[in-house]
């Protein structure tokens, strides 16, 4: 079933333009870019209707209920700290026929509240079956939704509420504090509270209602009841109508709202489906836990519903049993066949495996690495027997993720080739994807039927892609020698309509002819696959005039067992970069004992500890073939957790560079000065 080279073709009807490559597209789009997944599916709610008809008894969505919150107290660095553990029940499911009725009831309830297509509903909560059902309930009545990450500040929420004039907000109870501030001076009239959230404990809804008498405060269940007693048929919606205003999680300034029509979103799903439909079926079980306010997660979940698969809702805190009591983690309980994650998730799994392996005896280590070498060789040369060690040697690792995974998919940002190969061999084959909010998650996607190494994969059949030279950075599409490289520009039905109430930003985002400028640098390899080099904003010119790619270096240095998060920092005044890291405290403490460090040297702030981490990173640089100017010369070890709540990373775990530099300004300046 392997696909044939080239994996992308030149798009018909274009003339060669100096400084640009000819646009390329997926072979499936040879006679025209794809817009809709199938006949009759022209709006988002059509996905639900179709699956309810074709797969009425299939399990659509599954959720776990909170049984009990366990509170434990531990002494950490001479201070008592409270730890919260969750006890969850088994997954309970709704069939597709039940889910369709639920969405209609939600839409009917919103209509009874007086909403129509001229109003907007703001969704502000963690990923859950209730969140996605709210989006489909809105779609059934042509009501546009506005999405906001549950980690956004009150200022950001206030900005998007004010800009969109949303009159209804749906939120989780633990976000009432943030919402209370954000709702001031907004046009919100009704607050819908999702009491089904596992994080709902300890938040007084009645108190919120009493303190805010200006709002009509109801629960998610009460909205369903309202719709059940006032049923309305879904209304006709045009594919050109607005489906969603999705606010990006950018790390600079206030977030932009991307206007996405039903046609845009369906084209995005169609593009993704075109890359995977030959290896998925209605038997797929996909664990849903990434933010639904992110385009890739929202597109993925709707795609799973389109094919009749099952969504099992989880949370990053409950994926494993580390934060649970008396129950399994989501992965073991749900047993997914496909799982999507970001680099930090995959690096955490890899490091956990290596940590346990390092505690094993000589024989166990030898067996593991021998099996790894054999399977790697068999995969590289397509030899039989590559799965012979899967149960014997890698079985325990696979059981950590439920034991049924066929594919894992990395999104959000780049991942080191070594990590991709490691997890592909011991867990499940890793696929990689590239896309943006503005392109409805479309860009490029790898396939198990297309051999590739460092490239992402073939482009989506819903878009054309071209490269434009960036002479000032040394990237050219028509160089006499060397690859065709340049900024990635995208055009097609999956591309959004523009930024909400921001005509200047929209104009700046597009090149003539409707080509969206991604800000990413790419290359088409000789197989037709798209390779991502870096973001234009992540390229830094060094003192000697050469450029280094920060995100590329971070994906490599992130493989160190000594660190959990890393940001590479470079400056024109210096010849080489430094790193700012969130340390793997347990690993470093164990390593300091192993190396015989004194108590003073074992602290994270000691010079000896910094020297050990720096030596480790420089060794990784040598083994990865990095140049001298790409090799770090200093390290800043931080003492705060890098989470969206701390502001150091975005909700999709991308680095918030400006915030990090400002937060650790003194330490960074001291480190830079020390290296000269």
From Swiss-Prot:
UniProt GO cellular component terms: endoplasmic reticulum; lipid droplet; plasma membrane
Record pathway: Mycotoxin biosynthesis
Effect of deleting the gene: Does not affect fumonisin production. Increases the production of ceramide intermediates including 3-ketosphinganine, sphinganine and phytosphingosine in comparison to the control. Causes growth inhibition in both solid and liquid media.
Top class in the EC scheme: ligase
Subcellular location: Endoplasmic reticulum
Source organism, top-level taxon: Eukaryota
Protein name: Palmitoyl-CoA ligase FUM16
Species this protein is from: Gibberella moniliformis (strain M3125 / FGSC 7600)
Phylogenetic lineage: Eukaryota, Fungi, Dikarya, Ascomycota, Pezizomycotina
Gene transcribed to yield this protein: FUM16
């Amino acid at each position: 079933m392997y696909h044939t080279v080239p994996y992308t073709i030149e798009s018909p009807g274009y003339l060669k333009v100096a400084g640009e490559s000819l646009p390329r597209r997926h072979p499936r789009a040879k006679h025209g870019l794809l817009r809709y997944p199938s006949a009759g599916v022209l709006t988002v709610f059509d996905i639900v209707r179709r699956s309810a008809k074709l797969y009425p008894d299939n399990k659509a969505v599954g959720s776990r209920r909170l049984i009990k919150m366990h509170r434990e107290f531990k002494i950490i660095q001479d201070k008592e700290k409270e730890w919260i553990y969750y006890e969850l029940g088994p997954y309970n499911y709704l069939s597709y026929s039940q889910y369709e009725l639920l969405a209609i009831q939600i839409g009917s309830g919103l209509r009874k509240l007086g909403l129509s297509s001229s109003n907007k509903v703001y969704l502000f909560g963690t990923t859950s079956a209730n969140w996605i059902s709210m989006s489909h309930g809105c779609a059934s009545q042509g009501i546009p939704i506005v999405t906001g990450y549950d980690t956004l500040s009150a200022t950001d929420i206030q900005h998007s509420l004010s800009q969109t004039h949303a009159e209804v907000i749906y939120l989780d109870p633990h976000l009432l504090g943030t919402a209370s501030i954000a709702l001031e001076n907004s046009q919100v009239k009704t607050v819908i509270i999702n009491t089904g959230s596992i994080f709902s404990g300890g938040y007084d809804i009645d108190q919120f209602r009493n303190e805010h008498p200006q709002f009509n405060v109801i629960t998610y269940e009460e909205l369903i009841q309202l719709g059940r007693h006032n049923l309305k048929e879904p209304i006709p919606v045009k594919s050109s109508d607005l489906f969603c205003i999705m606010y990006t999680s950018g790390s600079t300034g206030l977030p932009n709202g991307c206007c996405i029509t039903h046609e845009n979103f369906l084209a995005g799903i169609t593009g993704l489906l075109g890359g995977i439909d030959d290896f998925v079926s209605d038997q797929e079980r996909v664990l849903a836990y990434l933010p639904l306010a992110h385009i890739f997660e929202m597109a993925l979940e709707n795609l799973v519903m389109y094919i009749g698969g099952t969504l099992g809702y989880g949370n990053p805190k409950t994926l494993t049993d580390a934060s649970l009591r008396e129950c399994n983690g989501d992965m073991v309980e749900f047993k997914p066949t496909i799982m999507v994650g970001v680099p930090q998730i995959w690096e955490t799994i890899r490091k956990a495996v290596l940590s346990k392996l390092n505690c094993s005896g000589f024989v166990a280590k030898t067996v593991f690495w021998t099996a790894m070498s054999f399977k790697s060789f068999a995969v590289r040369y397509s030899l039989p027997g590559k799965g012979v060690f899967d149960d014997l040697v890698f079985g325990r690792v696979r059981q950590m993720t439920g034991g049924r995974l066929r594919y894992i998919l990395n999104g959000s940002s780049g991942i080191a080739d070594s990590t991709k190969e490691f997890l592909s061999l011991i867990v499940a084959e890793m696929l990689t994807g590239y896309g943006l909010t503005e392109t409805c998650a479309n860009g490029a996607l790898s396939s198990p039927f297309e051999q590739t190494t460092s490239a992402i994969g073939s482009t989506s059949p819903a878009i054309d892609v071209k490269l434009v030279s960036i002479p000032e950075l040394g990237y050219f599409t028509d160089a006499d020698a060397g690859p065709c490289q340049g900024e990635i520009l995208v055009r097609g039905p999956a591309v959004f309509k523009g930024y909400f109430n921001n005509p200047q930003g929209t104009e700046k985002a597009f090149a003539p002819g409707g080509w969206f400028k991604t800000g990413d640098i790419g290359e088409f390899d000789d197989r037709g696959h798209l390779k991502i080099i870096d973001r234009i904003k992540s390229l830094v010119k060094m003192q000697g005039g050469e450029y280094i790619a920060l995100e590329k270096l971070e994906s490599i240095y992130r493989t160190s067992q000594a660190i959990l998060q890393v940001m590479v920092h470079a400056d024109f005044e210096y010849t080489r970069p430094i790193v700012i890291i969130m340390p793997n405290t347990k690993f470093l403490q164990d390593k300091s004992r192993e190396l015989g460090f004194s108590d003073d040297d074992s602290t994270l702030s000691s010079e000896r500890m910094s020297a050990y981490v720096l030596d480790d990173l420089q060794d990784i640089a040598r083994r990865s073939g990095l140049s001298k100017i790409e090799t770090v010369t200093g390290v800043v070890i931080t003492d705060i957790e890098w989470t969206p709540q701390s502001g150091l990373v975005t909700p999709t775990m991308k680095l918030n560079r400006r915030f990090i530099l400002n937060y650790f300004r003194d330490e960074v300046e001291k480190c830079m000065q020390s290296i000269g």
